Amino acid sequence: MAREYKIEDYRNFGIMAHIDAGKTTTTERILYYTGKSHKIGEVHDGAATMDWMEQEQERGITITSAATTTFWKGRDGKMRRFNIIDTPGHVDFTIEVERSLRVLDGAIALLDANAGVEPQTETVWRQAEKYNVPRMIFCNKMDKTGADFYRSVEMIKTRLGATAVVMQLPIGAETEFKGVIDLVEMNALIWRDESLGAQWDVVEIPEDMKAKAEEYREKLIETVVDIDEAATEAYLEGILPDNEQIRALVRRGTIDVKFHPMFCGTAFKNKGVQPLLDAVVDYLPSPMDIPAIKGIDFKTEAEIERHADDSEPLSMLAFKIMNDPFVGSLTFARIYSGKLEKGASVINTVKDKRERVGRMLQMHSNSREDIEEAFAGDIVALAGLKETTTGDTLCDPLKPVILERMEFPEPVIQIAIEPKTKGDQEKMGLALNRLAAEDPSFRVKTDQESGQTIIAGMGELHLDIIVDRMRREFKVEATVGAPQVAYRETITRTHEEDYTHKKQSGGTGQFARVKIVFEPNPEGDEFKFESKIVGGSVPKEYIPGVQKGIESVLSSGPLAGFPMLGVKATLIDGAFHDVDSSVLAFEIASRACFREAAKKAGAQLLEPMMKVEVVTPEDYVGDVIGDLNSRRGQIQGQESRGIAVVINANVPLANMFKYVDNLRSMSQGRAQYTMTFDHYSPVPSNVATEIQAKYSGQK
């Protein structure tokens, strides 16, 4: 079967934003106008097509990125193929955003016209910067009270440090919002309310807005000619680019991430969505426009590139595992090069295992269509893979490659969980393993001492939803303990320890002596090991044993048994025995050496500090600040945002449990907050003593 759409007509993009900026609604409108959805789903009545998990429909927030393929006819009359990923905006699910950005070519960043750039907008924006994803901006909810397009433009500069190229101006705002001015064509688009936004009239720019439109068109031209020498020279000579040249320059600047074209509208009231879709075609990259993906040759370890070309060897990245009630486990993958046929055998180079593709599906939210073949640029769901997890590379067994791995954050909160009945015991283990395979930011472990099952994640909501899914999807009833903070330990001063391990009573003996300097790692939270052995006092083949021994005890610090961060170990001397020394003997010696040293090197307890942003009406500012201070919070600053006040603070996670209830009652439900992990910080000594007493009893 031949390719239906040329690869240059593909647009793989995501929609990213703060919670409640209208992502799912915007995606719903896109599906409606591109003909994939016959009825518009509304988030607040629980019928949105993209939000297909039960909890999403109940809570009105998007948890999993649903991948959807749809089609759109551009201004030139040609059909384009869109692969859209709808991502969650709640901070507990940033891992989903990170995963989808990794496999997209472009993104639309959505802003709420009333709130502008919000904390989670900053977080997802930074994630997109990390992967250098070209972005457009859609200022949504222009019909909302307090909507201010121009303030949002300013906030993009001050808060994100980015350049927004304004492509449209709003006509009216709040309830008076009628349409937009197109600054390229210099005309106005007014939507007809009775047509559900499917029809609009192209009219002249209103008289009272002509001067503003001229001013913003001039700014647009000044910004875009700046990226091209010939265009700059022509502009300085008084020759202005024509409309097609403007579009070409905007496209180039967007793909090179020099600036971000900005549009406006209200998805809920069906205004502004179609021009946004035209802009996706005009300005976001096709798989051909972005640099070839880099990887490591599986055999030679040389760096190689794979281009978006069907004739190159197959390479794809698994970016999401999802449990589907009808098909079982589904692996979502982005094909970077080559083509894939149903039933093909591929190799997972990360696990070094062969996999067979049983079924291949093209997804529309939660409905699906079987396909026989997929090509470079496609995003597909594969059934029948046994070994593959998120971040793995799947490729041609004859030309194996490992594509860049994804990095996943460490969980900051954990809870103990117990099955209610004996029957739930086995089902719970299976359910938790399935859920952990789907979500790399969720971890499951067994406490060695108590035998309890501990689950860890990115926040209270994250773990609530995991427990909820266990009940609904796997029919497992469980009792959940109180949330526990993921504390860490470190050392604060340099200490040299000399340790000899000897066991020479009958049979093969064991002997190893190590002299190691332990100190805080100046380069960060990682563990760093160095060997400065000269003259062979510890033979080369035993040195990995020394490193392994220390690493094996880093998971349990001396104070309260928490994992250790930021330790540097330098092996400076030692001794061995011709017969009795072994890698294992050096492993045992270094393990004991570190245990001894950790107590003497100023061991210190660390706690996760959260970056908290509270948005509150002015009347409650005093109460909110007082309350944050009482939680050992450090106020970093405050600023006005319209009629509200934004308070920024760093607060220990330990003191933020159930904060949402407190904030609601303090502000009569009018204040909101967001919280993201910021850094680990030393615990004050009085609090540390309590924590040690509590956890040492459990060690």
From Swiss-Prot:
GTP binds at residues 17-24, 86-90, 140-143. GO terms for cellular component: cytoplasm. It is found in: Cytoplasm. GO terms for biological process: ribosome disassembly. It comes from the Bacteria. One of its GO terms (molecular function) is translation elongation factor activity. The keyword Cytoplasm applies. InterPro entries: EF-G-like_DII (IPR053905), EFG_II (IPR041095), EFG_III (IPR009022), EFG_III/V (IPR035647), EFG_IV (IPR047872), EFG_V (IPR035649), EFG_V-like (IPR000640), G_TR_CS (IPR031157). Keywords: Cytoplasm, Elongation factor, GTP-binding, Nucleotide-binding, Protein biosynthesis. Residues 8-288 form the tr-type G domain. Belongs to the TRAFAC class translation factor GTPase superfamily. Classic translation factor GTPase family. EF-G/EF-2 subfamily. Catalyzes the GTP-dependent ribosomal translocation step during translation elongation. During this step, the ribosome changes from the pre-translocational (PRE) to the post-translocational (POST) state as the newly formed A-site-bound peptidyl-tRNA and P-site-bound deacylated tRNA move to the P and E sites, respectively. Catalyzes the coordinated movement of the two tRNA molecules, the mRNA and conformational changes in the ribosome. This is Elongation factor G. It comes from Rhizobium johnstonii (strain DSM 114642 / LMG 32736 / 3841).
